[in-house]
Amino acid sequence: MYLKKYQIKVVNALKQFLQTARDTKTSFDIAKQALPDNMRHTLNWVQTTFQTSSLEYKDRCTNGLGNSYPRMIIKVPTGGGKTLLAVESIREYQNLFAQKRTGLVVWIVPSETIYSQTVQKIRDKGNPLRQLLDQCSGNRTIILEKGQRLTTNDIEENLVVLFVMIQSISRTNGKEALKVFQDSGGYDSFFPADNRYDLHEQLLKQVPNLDFISPLGTEQPLIMTSLGNAIRISKPFIIIDEIHKVFSENARKTIDSLNPEFVLGFSATPKAEMNVLVTITGLELKEEEM
C-alpha cells in the first residue's frame, strides 16, 4: 500500500526507535545477568532508549510485573490515516522489537463508529490493511472482539489482534468504563483447573498481579478467569486510538496493569506529559493533498 510522505516519516521514526529499543534491551538483559538481584533495577533500558533517541522521557511507565516499558505517542491530525499507521506499527513492532510473527496485539478504540469501521476493514481479507497484517503474520492473523474465544494456542501460533472499545475515561466513570477487562467468557485455556491450587499459586508467582479470589474455607488462591488476566499473561503490544481520552490516572494504571511490552497511542491533541515520538502537522497533510 502506498504511503504518503508524512506517513513514511512516522514509520521511519518508529523503526528507528524500535531498533534502538531492541538493541538496548538486549544489551541490558545481558548486563543484568552479571548484577546481584538488588541492583538489577538500576538498569533501565527504556530510559536509555529515550536518551539515545534524543526524546523527552516524561511518561515513565512501569507495568504490573514491575518492568519499565515505553508508552509512545504519534501526534497526527484527524484524517491522517491512523488506521494505516497503526497497522504499519504492528508490522514494525513484530519485525524489529518482538522479532516474531506471533503474539497478542490489543487495539483499543474510543467510539462505536470508529470501532465498527476499523474492525470491518481489518476482518476483510481483501482489504489492503488486512493484507499488510497477513504479510506480517505469514497469513496467520486472527481478529477477535471481546467475548470471543481466545486461547493460549491462538497466541502461540498466530498474530492475534484483539479489538476493545473503551470510551473516554474520567474520574466519575472510570470503574464502569474499564469493566470490559472483567469479561469472563472464553479464556479458560490460560488458567489451571479450579482444583489445582498448586498451579494457581505457581502462575501467581510468575505473574503476581493477576486478579484472584480465595474461596470460602480456604486461604489458597484461585485466579479469576477474565479477559484482563488473559491479557496480563500474554504481555501484549497495545495500540490506543485517541489516547488522550484514556489518559486519566485511573486509565493509565489500568493500562499498566495489563503488563504491556509496549504501548503506542495516536492523538491529534496529546497531553503535555505524554512521550511524543513524532509530530505530523496539518500543513504536512495539506501539502500531501495538493
Positions of PLM-derived features:
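RecA-like P-loop NTPase motor core of helicase/translocase proteins
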Residues: M1-M290
